[in-house]
From Swiss-Prot:
SUPFAM superfamilies: Ribosomal protein S7 (SSF47973). This is Small ribosomal subunit protein uS7cz/uS7cy. Keywords: Plastid, Ribonucleoprotein, Ribosomal protein, RNA-binding, rRNA-binding. The lineage of its organism: Eukaryota, Viridiplantae, Streptophyta, Embryophyta, Tracheophyta. GO terms for molecular function: rRNA binding; structural constituent of ribosome. It comes from Epifagus virginiana (Beechdrops). Belongs to the universal ribosomal protein uS7 family. GO terms for cellular component: plastid; small ribosomal subunit. InterPro entries: Ribosomal_uS7, Ribosomal_uS7_bac/org-type, Ribosomal_uS7_CS, Ribosomal_uS7_dom, Ribosomal_uS7_dom_sf. PANTHER family: RIBOSOMAL PROTEIN S7.
Length: 155
């Protein structure tokens, strides 16, 4: 038996302006080479653009987008007797949000456009409406999980 204590679970700190954990998750995922102030600039500009486009609270649009992209189920490769099967597994809320943030950023990087703030704002607005590349990725993941339901007993 281990003599070490259990590590306490760390919670993400909220960002300084909106005081929101989701914004901070986005900032930490968009961060490159330790330039956090640049990451904050990009996110805040994107939220400002969302405010101008939709005339709604940008945090509400962000929450809607992440809720729309968050997957309930995913597939995990599992090796059984020499062959690899895609086994569907349920995803917890934290992991689902992390996947949603990652998919939103990947989809916004793929978009054509001037700068990252513009592309991110467009992707977030589209995801909140129920369209866009990130939503397509979620639906694709759900389809794969549905197709491999026969292997659900291999969990």
């Amino acid at each position: 038996m281990s003599r070490r204590g259990t590590a306490e679970e760390k919670t993400a700190k909220p960002d300084p302006i909106y005081w929101n954990r989701l914004v901070n998750m986005l900032v930490n995922r968009i961060l490159k080479h330790g330039k956090k102030s640049l990451a904050y600039q990009i996110i805040y500009r994107a939220l400002k653009k969302i405010q101008q486009k939709t005339e709604k609270n940008p945090l509400y649009v962000l929450r809607q987008a992440i809720r729309g992209v968050t997957p309930d189920i995913a597939v995990k490769a599992r090796r059984v007797g020499g062959s690899t099967h895609q086994v569907p597994i349920e995803i917890g809320s934290t992991q689902g949000k992390a996947l949603a943030v990652r998919w939103l950023l990947v989809a916004s990087k793929k978009r054509p456009g001037q700068n990252m703030a513009f592309k991110l704002s467009s992707e977030l607005v589209d995801a909140a409406k129920g369209s866009g590349d990130a939503i397509r990725k979620k639906e694709e993941t759900h389809k794969m999980a549905e197709a491999s339901r026969a292997f659900a007993h291999l969990r």
